[in-house]
Design a protein with these regions (language model features):
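Alpha-helix initiation/capping motif
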Residues: 1-2, 45
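Short acidic-aromatic low-complexity motifs
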Residues: 2-33
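Short, flexible segments with low predicted structural confidence
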Residues: 23-30, 44, 70-71, 78
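A short gly/proline-enriched turn/hairpin at secondary-structure junctions
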Residues: 34-45
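A beta-strand edge to alpha-helix "cap/lid" segment located at domain peripheries
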Residues: 37-38, 53-113
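N-acyltransferase acceptor-side catalytic subdomain
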Residues: 49
Length: 113
């Protein structure tokens, strides 16, 4: 099954992720103006590009986060990524990110679980 243009952009971002230029790469994915991200297990929440850059990508930079995309699934307005994550301290964890797209195919909400 083929992915929508936004899901393909998310996939490209995840496959090529590098904490040094994470936000720059992410900014190529279409988003709404006030898109929202919640990562409850990490205690992170942000709304809009500036907060996403400062809070979410600040965390990625501080931890030199590495991501490995193991699968991506699109189901209606949802894009789900299964990831293996690793921090600079060597901590490894599995994560699922769910992206909710609006009617125009832009990312509106992100849950990192």
């Amino acid at each position: 099954m083929s992915l929508s243009p936004t899901a393909e952009a998310i996939k490209h971002y995840k496959v090529t992720f590098n904490w040094k230029n994470g936000f720059e790469s992410w900014s190529k994915v279409p988003t709404t103006e006030n898109y929202h991200m919640l990562a409850p297990n990490l205690g992170l929440e942000a709304t809009g590009a500036d907060e996403i850059r400062d809070i979410i990508f600040g965390f990625c930079t501080e931890n030199e986060l590495q991501q490995e995309l193991t699968d991506i699934i699109e189901h209606g307005q949802y894009v789900t990524c299964m990831l293996n994550l690793k921090t600079k301290s060597g901590e490894s964890l599995q994560c699922v990110e769910v992206f909710l797209l609006d009617d125009e195919g832009r990312v509106d909400k992100i849950w990192a679980l």
